[in-house]
């Protein structure tokens, strides 16, 4: 079977690795154009491109798939199937129709819940009990196609956006390989999604990461986990930015953002309802540290009565 793979970040690269180890032929890889990254803003290839180049697979990086030249280029590959994972470009219907068996997508949620760009983080933020990967047939709508296969994992009280991402990146690739086999032998039939159950996972916005201490502690604790490792929740103290990488629910009352107490166990801050004990922070110019380490060296900075977010 001739497969074209389309994807961009590390999550997608894990899927490509599994396909390279499968019996199927990967005839080409599509990925986003190289982007500036790092302090030097040097153009860097995507994780998928780096993997494809290492395996001598032809790489295509069109700005869009909406023009006739890009579509003709894809059609010339004569693909039986296109596998799409976190690619980042919209595939118009004419592109979806090119492969003999159509296009399938590995999406990091239990569809129809969390269609869209940031399903992993939104699941943690919402306090969902479980997440997973859905392999679906693609159609013109955003993550609306018939579902071929689902794999499920519980979301623990300790899961972050990062830990859930890594777990789903392990679960998704074998599911895709299994789905391809089911498509090839006709044993897998798609299940239509119930649009009434759909929710939308909006793209992450850095502005969302600014902590609003008037919100309930339980919501903020989930947000802090969801946004770790990116974009990382933050607040201000003494006019300086403070990144908050981990927190636990605590008790206590005070003005939102007020420091209620500080000890090696954590920095207890009042919220709109209850309080949070901040256990891992990063100050400007420093690395992320447990609060017990910060407390030993910067005790005066975290005096009770000070207010974060002002």
UniProtKB/Swiss-Prot annotation:
It comes from the Bacteria. One of its GO terms (cellular component) is cytosol. (6S)-5,6,7,8-tetrahydrofolate binds at residues 109-112. PROSITE patterns: GART. Disulfide bonds: none annotated. Transmembrane segments: none annotated. InterPro entries: Fmt (IPR005794), Formyl_trans_C (IPR005793), Formyl_trans_C_sf (IPR037022), Formyl_transf_N (IPR002376), Formyl_transf_N_sf (IPR036477), Formyl_transferase-like_C_sf (IPR011034), GART_AS (IPR001555), Met-tRNA-FMT_C (IPR044135). It catalyses: L-methionyl-tRNA(fMet) + (6R)-10-formyltetrahydrofolate = N-formyl-L-methionyl-tRNA(fMet) + (6S)-5,6,7,8-tetrahydrofolate + H(+). Keywords: Protein biosynthesis, Transferase. It is an enzyme of class 2 (transferase). Signal peptide: none annotated. One of its GO terms (molecular function) is methionyl-tRNA formyltransferase activity. This is Methionyl-tRNA formyltransferase. It comes from Pseudomonas putida (strain ATCC 47054 / DSM 6125 / CFBP 8728 / NCIMB 11950 / KT2440). The gene is fmt.
């Amino acid at each position: 079977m001739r497969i074209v793979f389309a994807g961009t970040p590390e999550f997608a690269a894990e899927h490509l690795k599994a396909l390279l180890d499968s019996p199927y032929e990967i005839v080409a890889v599509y990925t986003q154009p190289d982007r500036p990254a790092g302090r030097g803003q040097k153009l860097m290839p995507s994780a998928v491109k780096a993997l494809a180049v290492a395996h001598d697979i032809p790489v295509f990086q069109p700005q869009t798939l909406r023009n006739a030249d890009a579509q003709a280029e894809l059609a010339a590959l004569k693909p039986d199937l296109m596998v799409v994972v976190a690619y980042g470009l919209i595939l118009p219907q004419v592109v979806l129709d090119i492969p003999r068996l159509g296009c399938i997508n590995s999406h990091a949620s239990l569809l129809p819940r969390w269609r869209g760009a940031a399903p992993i983080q939104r699941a943690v933020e919402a306090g969902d009990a479980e997440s997973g990967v859905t392999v679906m047939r693609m159609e013109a709508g955003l993550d609306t196609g018939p579902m071929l296969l689902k794999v499920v994992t519980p979301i623990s009280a300790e899961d972050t956006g990062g830990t859930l991402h890594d777990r789903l990146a392990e679960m998704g690739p074998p599911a895709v390989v299994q789905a391809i086999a089911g498509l090839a032998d006709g044993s897998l039939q798609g299940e239509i999604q119930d649009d009434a159950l759909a929710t939308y996972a909006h793209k992450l916005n850095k502005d969302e990461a600014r902590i609003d201490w008037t919100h309930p502690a339980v919501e903020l604790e989930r947000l802090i986990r969801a946004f770790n490792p990116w974009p990382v929740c933050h607040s201000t103290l003494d006019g300086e930015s403070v990144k908050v990488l981990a927190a636990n629910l605590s008790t206590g009352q005070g003005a939102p953002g007020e420091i209620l107490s500080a000890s090696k166990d954590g920095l207890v801050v009042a919220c709109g309802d209850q309080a949070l004990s901040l256990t891992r922070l990063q100050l400007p110019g420093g690395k992320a540290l447990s609060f017990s380490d910060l407390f030993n060296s910067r005790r005066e900075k975290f005096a009770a009565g000070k207010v974060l977010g002002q």
